[in-house]
Amino acid sequence: MNPEQFQMALAEKGIELSDDQMKQFHDYFEMLVEWNEKMNLTAITDEKEVYLKHFYDSISAAFYVDFTKFDTICDVGAGAGFPSLPIKICFPHLKVSIVDSLKKRMTFLDALAEKLGLTDVHFYHDRAETFGQNKAHREKYDLVTARAVARMSVLSELCMPLVKKGGSFLVMKAAQAEQELQTAEKAIKLFGGKVEEHFSFSLPVEESERNIYVITKTKETPNKYPRKPGTPNKLPIE
């Protein structure tokens, strides 16, 4: 998917990108490849692959979820900024917070936000477990996203504490997601969530399966969650 195909594919979904926004994606791609030579940000560096598997894939959530109704977003373990920064480029009104435990990624994201001229974007170098216990952020976000490889039960413990009551947790997964969801149902309920919607689709060109789950926060997360750093991964609630 080249930049022109990317722009057309989004337009077909009702997301029209201006020349300035296309320039932001171009600069994002160039910086990603340049910085990737000195730090491991992504295994995907081919332009067409980046536009499809990073940019388009990140924005695909907006085909099913109306981002205009959200104000604050927190992206847990965003790595090189996915999915929140491509979404931010498309929906500039969003106030985005990104949490990642690797300091060098923060350096990249800071430089990237400055280069792209992104405002209302904040980066926090922290473990998700610690961040979720921080009163300044706990239950403060309209939407929390995770496009991560961790199991859904683990992601729920890391992300649900950050979602405000009535807000949403958006999980982006590849294949075998239904099985993961069944295992995570106990955890989702414990942390105050209810699975509201599930969307399944194929990524264009390569036709790989994608799943998006929208989990609504119906009640507050018990204070003891998230547990200490490392514990959710070692002893997932399932």
From Swiss-Prot:
Main subcellular location: cytoplasm
Residues passing through the membrane, by range: none
Record CDD domains: AdoMet_MTases
Molecular-function annotations in GO: rRNA (guanine-N7-)-methyltransferase activity
Localization, UniProt: Cytoplasm
Region (Disordered): 219-238
SUPFAM superfamilies, per the entry: S-adenosyl-L-methionine-dependent methyltransferases (SSF53335)
Keywords from the named record: Cytoplasm, Methyltransferase, rRNA processing, S-adenosyl-L-methionine, Transferase
Annotated signal peptide: none
Binding positions for S-adenosyl-L-methionine per the UniProt entry: 77, 82, 128-129, 147
GO cellular component: cytosol
Enzyme Commission number: 2.1.1.-
Listed InterPro entries: rRNA_ssu_MeTfrase_G, SAM-dependent_MTases_sf
Purpose: Specifically methylates the N7 position of guanine in position 535 of 16S rRNA.
Family: Belongs to the methyltransferase superfamily. RNA methyltransferase RsmG family.
Protein name: Ribosomal RNA small subunit methyltransferase G
